Regions:
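Detector for small/aliphatic-rich hydrophobic stretches
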Residues: 2-5, 16-92, 114-121
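Conserved P-loop NTPase
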Residues: 6, 25-29, 33, 39-43, ...
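Conserved nucleotide-binding/hydrolysis micro-motifs of P-loop NTPases
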Residues: 32, 98-100, 125-129, 137, ...
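Conserved inter-motif catalytic segment of the P-loop NTP-binding fold
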Residues: 89, 97-100, 107-197, 315
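Substrate-engagement module of ASCE P-loop NTPases
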Residues: 189-210, 214, 230-241
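Short regulatory helix/loop adjacent to the ATP-binding pocket of P-loop NTPases
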Residues: 220-230
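Conserved small/polar residues in nucleotide/adenosyl-binding loops
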Residues: 327
Length: 328
């Protein structure tokens, strides 16, 4: 078999080239070409085509049942961002800065889902004992939560087929490894191929799968940009680690609106919902103070009251300077 040659793949648009470019010919971005090993293929498409079979085509009026059956997570703010709950067979990508609370919110959701569903939590970053310690701290006591400490997607796929869980959580996609890819875990090729495998599982078995994704130094999702095109929903968990409040925002949602946000507060026993963000924004605001006012902004279907402050001082420069800062 011929030796595989490395290729250069753009992390933004997925453009592939046999040589390195400083500027991607596909999207025009700079310094986005990374060296990767292509996926090994034992046989060509022409050789495989003889084994393909036709599949019956369904007409739209022949599809019966609830095509958008949703599962509640038990967290109203999370359901709001998802568009009313989890859609069966959907692939959801949850991304955010390290330590922001991605694994925490998903483990808390397992407590409610475990009342009526079997949840499989796959971790490539923590051992089963470490997940148990975090679950005890968060008060997660459900017996319908299976833990699998594994990074090989082939083993994970076979486990899902045998266990037949109702919901699957992958933490995280950057730690998963596909044997057909020669590159290391977290590379562009590995992330893309592993995500495609999980997408196939979700659609074939009707199992909703949550995927935790890391972010790069620029704040974008680590890995190829095509990752966001593969999944059904992209959620960002935002917030400053020095502050206790977190905002869950939907960037892409094939089954709902992307205008909704969810507000949470990080407490000692996990994340708590903030059902009235306006009260949070205006708490402790002094009355009858000059230079401040209350403004109403729309986030999805609900209005939020926020305080706007203005400060004017004399300047020694010829051109006045205008600056703004947002603080939650």
């Amino acid at each position: 078999m011929a030796k595989l040659k490395s290729v250069y793949v753009c992390s933004e648009c997925g453009y592939e080239s046999a040589k390195w470019y400083g500027k991607c010919p596909g999207c025009g971005e700079w310094n986005t070409m990374n060296e990767e090993m292509p996926v090994s293929s034992k046989s060509s498409v022409s050789q495989k085509s003889s084994s393909y079979k036709t599949q019956p085509v369904l007409h739209l009026n022949e599809i019966n049942g609830d095509v958008e059956k949703r599962i509640s997570t038990g967290v109203k703010e999370f359901d709001r961002v998802l568009g009313g709950g989890i859609v069966e067979g959907s692939l959801v990508l949850l991304s955010g800065d390290p330590g922001i609370g991605k694994s925490t919110i998903l483990l808390q959701i397992c407590q409610f889902l475990g009342k009526s569903k079997y949840v499989l939590y796959v971790s490539g970053e923590e051992s089963a004992n470490q997940i148990k310690l975090r679950a005890v701290r968060l008060g997660v006591t459900t017996e319908n939560l299976g833990i699998l400490a594994q990074t090989d997607v082939g083993t994970i796929a076979e486990t899902i087929r045998s266990e037949k869980p109702d919901v699957v959580i992958i933490d995280s996609i950057q730690t998963m490894v596909c044997d057909e890819c020669a590159s290391s875990a977290g590379s562009i090729t590995q992330v893309r191929e592993c995500t495609n495998i999980f997408m196939h599982i979700a659609k074939s078995f009707g199992i909703p799968i949550f995927i935790v994704g890391h972010v790069n130094k620029d704040g974008g999702i680590a890995g190829p940009k095509v990752l966001e095109h593969i999944v059904d929903t992209v959620l960002y968990f935002e917030g400053e680690r020095n502050y206790s409040y977190r905002i869950l925002r939907g960037v892409k949602n094939r089954f709902g609106s992307t205008n909704e946000i969810g507000v949470f507060e990080m407490q000692q026993n996990g994340l708590a919902e903030v059902e009235n963000p306006s009260m949070l924004m205006l708490s402790g605001r002094p009355k009858n103070v000059s230079g401040t006012c209350v403004a109403c902004i729309m986030e999805g279907s609900r209005p939020i009251l926020a305080e706007v402050q203005g400060l004017v001082t004399a300047t020694g420069f010829g051109t006045p300077r205008r600056d703004r800062k947002s603080v939650v």
